[in-house]
UniProtKB/Swiss-Prot annotation:
<dbReference type="InterPro" id="IPR027417">
    <property type="entry name" value="P-loop_NTPase"/>
</dbReference>
<keyword id="KW-0131">Cell cycle</keyword>
<feature type="region of interest" description="Disordered">
    <location>
        <begin position="1049"/>
        <end position="1074"/>
    </location>
</feature>
<feature type="coiled-coil region">
    <location>
        <begin position="326"/>
        <end position="418"/>
    </location>
</feature>
<dbReference type="InterPro" id="IPR007406">
    <property type="entry name" value="MukB_N_dom"/>
</dbReference>
<keyword id="KW-0067">ATP-binding</keyword>
<dbReference type="InterPro" id="IPR032520">
    <property type="entry name" value="MukB_hinge"/>
</dbReference>
<dbReference type="Pfam" id="PF04310">
    <property type="entry name" value="MukB"/>
</dbReference>
<dbReference type="Pfam" id="PF13558">
    <property type="entry name" value="SbcC_Walker_B"/>
</dbReference>
<dbReference type="GO" id="GO:0051301">
    <property type="term" value="P:cell division"/>
</dbReference>
<dbReference type="GO" id="GO:0006260">
    <property type="term" value="P:DNA replication"/>
</dbReference>
<dbReference type="GO" id="GO:0005737">
    <property type="term" value="C:cytoplasm"/>
</dbReference>
<feature type="coiled-coil region">
    <location>
        <begin position="835"/>
        <end position="923"/>
    </location>
</feature>
<dbReference type="GO" id="GO:0030261">
    <property type="term" value="P:chromosome condensation"/>
</dbReference>
<feature type="coiled-coil region">
    <location>
        <begin position="509"/>
        <end position="602"/>
    </location>
</feature>
<feature type="binding site">
    <location>
        <begin position="34"/>
        <end position="41"/>
    </location>
    <ligand>
        <name>ATP</name>
    </ligand>
</feature>
<dbReference type="InterPro" id="IPR042501">
    <property type="entry name" value="MukB_hinge_sf"/>
</dbReference>
Amino acid sequence: MIERGKFRSLTLINWNGFFARTFDLDELVTTLSGGNGAGKSTTMAAFVTALIPDLTLLHFRNTTEAGATSGSRDKGLHGKLKAGVCYSMLDTINSRHQRVVVGVRLQQVAGRDRKVDIKPFAIQGLPMSVQPTQLVTETLNERQARVLSLAELKDKLDEMEGVQFKQFNSITDYHSLMFDLGIIARRLRSASDRSKFYRLIEASLYGGISSAITRSLRDYLLPENSGVRKAFQDMEAALRENRLTLEAIRVTQSDRDLFKHLISEATDYVAADYMRHANERRVHLDQALAFRRELYTSRKQLAAEQYKHVDMARELGEHNGAEGSLEADYQAASDHLNLVQTALRQQEKIERYEADLEELQIRLEEQNEVVAEAAEMQDENEARAEAAELEVDELKSQLADYQQALDVQQTRAIQYNQAISALARAKELCHLPDLTPESAAEWLDTFQAKEQEATEKLLSLEQKMSVAQTAHSQFEQAYQLVAAINGPLARSEAWDVARELLRDGVNQRHLAEQVQPLRMRLSELEQRLREQQEAERLLAEFCKRQGKNFDIDELEALHQELEARIASLSDSVSSASEQRMALRQEQEQLQSRIQHLMQRAPVWLAAQNSLNQLSEQCGEEFTSSQEVTEYLQQLLEREREAIVERDEVGARKNAVDEEIERLSQPGGAEDQRLNALAERFGGVLLSEIYDDVSLEDAPYFSALYGPSRHAIVVPDLSQIAEQLEGLTDCPEDLYLIEGDPQSFDDSVFSVDELEKAVVVKIADRQWRYSRFPSLPIFGRAARENRIESLHAEREVLSERFATLSFDVQKTQRLHQAFSRFIGSHLSVAFEDDPEAEIRRLNGRRVELERALATHESDNQQQRLQFEQAKEGVSALNRLLPRLNLLADETLADRVDEIQERLDEAQEAARFVQQYGNQLAKLEPVVSVLQSDPEQFEQLKEDYAWSQQMQRDARQQAFALAEVVERRAHFSYSDSAEMLSGNSDLNEKLRQRLEQAEAERTRAREALRSHAAQLSQYSQVLASLKSSYDTKKELLNDLQRELQDIGVRADSGAEERARQRRDELHAQLSNNRSRRNQLEKALTFCEAEMENLARKLRKLERDYHEMREQVVTAKAGWCAVMRMVKDNGVERRLHRRELAYLSADELRSMSDKALGALRLAVADNEHLRDVLRLSEDPKRPERKIQFFVAVYQHLRERIRQDIIRTDDPVEAIEQMEIELSRLTEELTSREQKLAISSRSVANIIRKTIQREQNRIRMLNQGLQSVSFGQVNSVRLNVNVRETHATLLDVLSEQQEQHQDLFNSNRLTFSEALAKLYQRLNPQIDMGQRTPQTIGEELLDYRNYLEMEVEVNRGSDGWLRAESGALSTGEAIGTGMSILVMVVQSWEDEARRLRGKDISPCRLLFLDEAARLDARSIATLFELCERLQMQLIIAAPENISPEKGTTYKLVRKVFQNTEHVHVVGLRGFAPQLPETLPGTQTEDTPSEAS
């Protein structure tokens, strides 16, 4: 039995009232008794300070300086010390019987802050005979002693043999030593742990149920599952590292793409410029040769152009002299044509206007008659409308008067007045003063007859008016015709003049008939004259071109000679044309073939490059497509074998991973179902109980238990019998062992140990022989050893798998390269070299071009002679038909004679044309000019007077008719008849009024209609008169203008004038055309000469410059080639397919690559500077330097441990394969690292169940504790509802939330926090991050709620709160909980410390007088049962039956304050035994 460590004594040195006092501590209860201020709290403060020397925690509330402003800094410690060095030391003896003295040196720090300096220390190996006071004091004499400083104490202890002194700079180290030596129950690693320990001591010191303790019971009682947390942290760290590695791989892949892009663009940039310079060098050589050939050709052309210029200048001078006379003749002919055209247009206008005037004259006469008729009709309509208006007004007046009279019974008087009024009006109009109603009817007949007579007379005058008007218009028309022909004349002379004009018109018409024959004759003669002049001009021109004068008789012989020459030259030209066509056709065929080959050459070169790459990659040479396909089949077989081997290694690696994963399960359970069953049965796995077995014992225990090594240990087998019924989800063999998991041993079997084997006697008739396994996995150490060996094996397998994966991917990429080659290049890769064929065809093309140039020169001379002969024949063909015209000399005189006769005939034709129509109209009406009708005006006046008379007669007849109608109004018989008559009269008046109003409406409508019609007729008449007058004036003006022109306008004059003008224009145009041709040719010749001269100068300059450039470029090109060959990059740069691109295409390719390179090297200062220098077009070697720098830059970044090549291109290919393999491997590793949510829930549930069982065991120790009415105390541990829901979801519904746990963006902790928020949206998470919340959720303690309950009196179990308990009950309950906490700490620390140490247990209790005797006795009993030490402070002696009691009395002696201490050991029947060291009072003395 391991003895528990004990505190032996407490020593106070130089404290307030205690100079050198040692309190021996009882093994159970030490009581400090005394009044107020006796020093009880100081003694306990010294103990606590030595136990927890942390000034941030120490705070002694029972201080004499309460309320002081510096109290917050003092914390109650400064006032308990004396000036100088102070000590507080604890003398302990642990379970190993080692004496350890731990303590602190305290010293007040001068200043206003009242600070205290604390230095912890420890002393080991001190003999039991040495007292603590002897160590730190030095006796000066009988009455004086001195306190040693810490340095002096160290020196003193160094002199003692076997004594170790340790001074600590950190409280953590101090507490670590105390924990290791069994002085404190818990390892205090941090300030948080020290705070918990201090709160525990403080809670016990002041008694009661501490709220700080009860609120944090989980932290005090439940141990931190650091292993699980660390496992999760390691898992997340591994996942994070894995993801960072994947991200780094992605970055590396991006860098690989960047490097690949850099190589590609750098190659395009430099190779395009390299090939462009190579092409330009070849082009410059060709240009230099072309310049030299063109220079010689241009000199020949210049000499020929100079000869040609002299001939054209002479001919141009002759044409300039002839152009002046032709221009004058052409201008005269143009003017004459314009006059003739003007006269013809004038004549046409005159004829058109005369026809218009005749038509207007007829329309004007007709319109006059229409207007006259319309005016008469208008007068009648006006009279009818006035009469209708008067009648309506009269009837309305009568009807109105009648209505008024009818209303006042005076109708008769009104009607009589109306009749009188009508009678008076009739008298006035008819001039009949004696008119009566009786005679009105007779007068009505008379006036109606008068109206009829006036109407008849008006009609008679209207007929006479019409006849007179017709005669008058005929005379006027004839008179106007005579005046138009002869001009103004008297009306009396019109007859004579008209007859003379008719006789003259007959003669003029006869002459006019001869115009057309004369004109045709003249036109014929003029045409012959012009042909004669043209023949003379052609003859002169022909003689000029031939260079000699020819007679007319010699022309036919010359024509035959030229035709013979043309025939001979034509054969030569045609044969030359065929020969030239054949040469050109062959040249075109060659050019087409070369173009076809040039188009095929890049494809062939690309195929060759691809074939060379394949040959380099596989180390084989291919000469035919069959060899390529055969090698591809070999690749497929090799790839299949590698894949099979890789899959075998991968399967073994996966098996190792699965075994590692199985062995890494917590508790050593190889089957997850065992954990669930253990939780279900309330048991513990046997492997978990033996988890701490050593590696040496693992084979023995593995053989001992054999197949039952995975059994479940349950407290009672009988209680789970029912649960075994229907159990299916379990291993095939499930072993159950009955036993206490807390104190399980291997006594369940009878076993005999043999050599490397055991014999287990399971029953009397059943034994089991088991050998020790060579690879035991029973116990954590064995599993870790096995896991370590498996990890080593896995590393070897991983390396082999990586190598095989690399080989497989390399083979696959090679297979893909062969497949691409077969699909893209196989058809052309093994064809003949097109470049060699191009060189051969180019040589033949040069020969053809030379032959064509020679042929063209010879053919040009023959063609020139042929053209000259054809031109001479053409001129003679135009001359020979006109030889008879050249001999006719009287042609010009005949033309002049016919011209005079034509002029006379044209003058007569113009007279007939001008006045022929007027004469034809005058001839039938000339007889009306003999008499002039002057009585027309008198007839018009008579007609108007008759019209007025008819209107007056009509009005008189209407007035008399009204009187006759009103005759009934003049007499009435009586009033009744009058009323009856009135009614009839009223009706008649209304009917007449309606008829009169209708008649008035019709009259008004007719009046308006006829008025509009009359207005329209009048307007038309005015328009016709105006148009007639205007056209008459225009006709007179046109006739005067025609006379002013002075040209006879006949039908053939315009044609002759136009023909003459056109002939002159043709001659002038031909002359000008020839002159322009000569001028242009001369200008062109001069320009050509100037261009040739300038071209010669330029060619000479270009030729010399090109020669210099070729020579200079040759030197630069040699330097470039030397640099390319020295650096071994010619294969990369000399890309033959680029030779077929133009300079612009290559420059564009280089510029595009340059733009991409600027972006690619923007972050690399060295490459950026080299690239900037390489942009100089005059220094092509700098581009080579840049390309070399890029390759060197990439070579430096090749990891030679992974990639074994110096070529960056090959390195990139290998890097791509390696990165792909790493990505695949890391992705699978991430999937294996990720823990399932079900596993997390099981781990947390299992931990919670284990801790609940542990708390249940701790509760058993509290069942017998009672204080006052408190019969028992217990702890309740419950799982929070929200967290229980989380566990359920994690274990059973995890599929619904895979979006969280499968996310690569979230760690497991963050996913867990997101799930918790999703399940509990009502909970505010504050400002905490998901990672922090997730880490809290991985701690099982946050899932539990703990509370203290007491069984008090009749109330039963209640929640332990200070308000529900008495002071003594609260103190006892709190002490019980603190004891439980200490015991829990010890259990937790047992795994961290040696099992041979049982730590000290000590608690405090201040003001213990508040407890009754029973409670004190219970405390004593609790301390005895739990082997716990207790220090109690009380004002009065509490009379303990056991333990040690110190009586403290503070006294003043000689102005010096000190505490008098008396110690007693228990109260027994015998006298109390005086404890050693307490017989004399403690007399303080000043330190020297």
